Amino acid sequence: PIAGSMVLAAILLKLGGYGIIRMMQILPTTKTDMFLPFIVLALWGAILANLTCLQQTDLKSLIAYSSVSHMGLVVAAIIIQTPWGLSGAMALMIAHGFTSSALFCLANTTYERTHTRILILTRGFHNILPMTTTWWLLANLMNIATPPTMNFTSELLIMSALFNWCPTTIIMLGLSMLITASYSLHMFLSTQMGYPLLNSQTEPTHTREHLLMILHIIPLAMVSMKPELII
């Protein structure tokens, strides 16, 4: 069900990050070197989740693994216990909550018209539903942290905090972000570009679907323009 996926990605997944933030308050802050294995595991987990996204053929699975990879960055940022890391983690949790929820909503819009979630079978929608293609483009740009979105601000904070703590982490972070851009582009091209493979009649988009996307994009844009609200 689409509602379950949206709530799971936007809220329940972030409860784990909130729990780690609360737990870190009772752990020693002066000796963060002892947390190095956990940080490496979090970043390596993010890379593996991103690589898993690249080989997905199911649209919902791809978006779900995308959420997992972003939470790896959040965990790494929280564990180093610096103000920048914590601010970046909180900002990324909020920004990615909106982004992944919007992507699940768009995936459901596609599924209702094609009755399949296989990427290769959902192509060609830019000719049929051009407005939906615009929403797909915006959601994917937010997913790859394009400026001036909140995702960009949060990933920049996380990258700065981790690089300041250990410069070697920039290799894993850079690799993770490169793969994120690759699968986001792959997802957009697979679902929107090319010629439609299904000959069934497609119903037009409803106002409620556009309203749902606007209610995802506008809060994220407002927070992007005034990040003091959460950072």
From Swiss-Prot:
Region forming the signal peptide: none
One Pfam entry name: Proton_antipo_M
Domain of life of the source: Eukaryota
First-listed, main subcellular location of the protein, grouped into a coarse class: mitochondrion
Keywords: Electron transport, Membrane, Mitochondrion, NAD, Respiratory chain, Translocase, Transmembrane, Transmembrane helix, Transport, Ubiquinone
Any single Gene Ontology cellular-component annotation: mitochondrial membrane
PANTHER family, alphabetized: NADH-UBIQUINONE OXIDOREDUCTASE CHAIN 4
Name the UniProt record assigns to this protein: NADH-ubiquinone oxidoreductase chain 4
Species, as recorded: Trimeresurus stejnegeri
Gene: MT-ND4
